[in-house]
Amino acid sequence: MLFIRSLAFNIALYVNTIVQMIIWAPLYFLLPRKNAWFVPKFWAASCLWLHKILAGARAEISGVEHLPSGPCIIAPKHQSFWDTIAFLPSIPDALYILKRELMWIPLFGWYVAKMRMIPIDRGSRSKALRQAVKIGRERMRENRQLIIYPEGTRRPPGAEPAYKYGIVELYAQLQVPVVPVAHVAGLYWPRRKFMRYPGVIRARFLPPIEPGLSREDFLQRLIRETEAACDELLLEAARSPNHPPLPPTAIARIEELKKDRS
């Protein structure tokens, strides 16, 4: 049954994406950029609904009140495709940093281009970071919310923190609050895996880190607060009845936490 539900959801996800891009295209490209935001937000919400109905995984997102009313940086953990869509309905005017190659995909790339995201060449990290800072500063004047994954790539729940320098430089240069986001969605929607596991996927927007800290103080605070919240969510998920399979990184981290608290 789990395989069938996973298969049904994976097929529905792609079909839903393609169909919505085609159906909404005439209206989406005619509307002004901000007015057109309801289309990707509706798509993201519909994907979460399909995930709930077909795979049995319900999203429960808290702490949205911590989002500043003006420009900010949102820094979620990156474990799954789930965290690229789940927060979109909650963010007023999201701004993503993405690989420039995604802009070359027919139709999808046009959708992204309309929202004026930040495409970068990941082959040159220093150049990509300078470009992200330059364009990010321009977009901040439009009261947008920049989403960046501090660890860069997807990592399994419980893995050792591996935060990159990019988030630090953006914090220092853009001088806006940073809102960490904790979750363990990788338990339910694992990276590079076919199976989708049922349960409640809890995510939490944490209180913002205001600008003004030194680079090192900011990084240590970001890691400390994000990882502490992720640890709590991991323990909560592991204690839940019929919890999803725990990857080795999650098992090892839970054992560490138990020792520390004993």
Task: Name what the model sees in each region.
Residues 21-41, 45, 52-54, 69-125:
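Catalytic core of membrane glycerolipid acyltransferases/transacylases, capturing the structured
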Residues 61, 118-121, 211:
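Short acidic-hydrophobic, aromatic-tinged amphipathic segments that line or gate anion-handling sites
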Residues 4-29:
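A hydrophobic membrane-anchoring feature enriched in long, contiguous, low-charge segments
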Residues 63-67:
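Glycine-rich helix-loop-beta junction characteristic of Rossmann-like nucleotide cofactor-binding loops
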